[in-house]
C-alpha cells in the first residue's frame, strides 16, 4: 500500500514538473523571438517608440 502511494506521489510530481518545464519553454520562446503582430513588447521596441501624436482638432471647432 505504501509503495502505491509513493508511485502516486511520484507521478504527480513528474506531471507538475513537466507542466512547469513546458510553461518555462513557452515563456522563453516568447521572450527570445516574439511573433509578428504579437501583443508582447520587448524592451528594445519600447526604447524605439515615438511619443504618440495628439488627436487632430475637430473640423467644427476650427484652429485657434
From Swiss-Prot:
Keywords: Lipid droplet, Membrane, Secreted, Stress response, Transmembrane, Transmembrane helix. It is a single-pass membrane protein. Residues 42-51 have a biased composition (Polar residues). Pfam families: HILPDA. Induction: By hypoxia (at protein level). One of its GO terms (cellular component) is lipid droplet. Residues 42-64 are annotated as: Disordered. It is found in: Lipid droplet; Secreted; Membrane. GO terms for molecular function: signaling receptor binding. The gene is Hilpda. Increases intracellular lipid accumulation. Stimulates expression of cytokines including IL6, MIF and VEGFA. Enhances cell growth and proliferation. Signal peptide: none annotated. Residues 1-37 are annotated as: Required for targeting to lipid droplets. The chain crosses the membrane at residues 7-24. It comes from the Eukaryota. This is Hypoxia-inducible lipid droplet-associated protein. Residues 55-64 have a biased composition (Basic and acidic residues). One of its GO terms (biological process) is cellular response to hypoxia.
Amino acid at each position: 500500500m505504501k509503495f502505491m502511494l509513493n508511485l502516486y506521489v511520484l507521478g504527480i510530481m513528474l506531471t507538475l514538473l513537466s507542466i512547469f518545464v513546458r510553461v518555462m519553454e513557452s515563456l522563453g520562446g516568447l521572450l527570445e523571438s516574439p511573433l509578428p503582430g504579437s501583443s508582447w513588447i520587448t524592451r528594445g521596441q519600447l526604447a524605439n517608440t515615438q511619443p504618440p501624436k495628439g488627436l487632430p482638432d475637430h473640423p467644427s471647432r476650427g484652429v485657434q
